[in-house]
């Protein structure tokens, strides 16, 4: 689990994308070959809020359909690394942004949070790993909790819960 508000190490998209680059000055993904990409690095917590590692999320987004091909690399020091993949449907967020723009409401808070399972059913996979996860196979799904969307600062207070079942 990670929060974009408190756990972001680095984040990059194409210039003018929904997310502002972090830290300031990090290279943007502006070249045509990678302009549909999203790259984030985050601290990772377990379900109890304990810091357990760090990871990356990489996406290539089809902006016409809001469908993304997404991979995660989760590094848990002393245990190993997990590699996950999924097809992700982010249309709930695209619709929310379009609604905010139409309403000229450029900052929107959600209480309770807007909750979305973005993993397209049957596509979330544990595809391998290292250390104790070296033979890992299984399923995963991503559940997002959106607390605030700020289109002015291009900041989203979003918690990602990554559920993993290994067999």
What would you call each of these model-derived segments?
Residues 133-167:
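C-terminal or internal capping secondary-structure element at the end of a domain, subdomain, or sheet
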Residues 39, 67-71, 126-128, 137, ...:
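Extracellular structured ligand-interaction cores
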Residues 60, 129, 145-147:
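Short beta-turn/strand-loop junction motif enriched in small, turn-promoting residues
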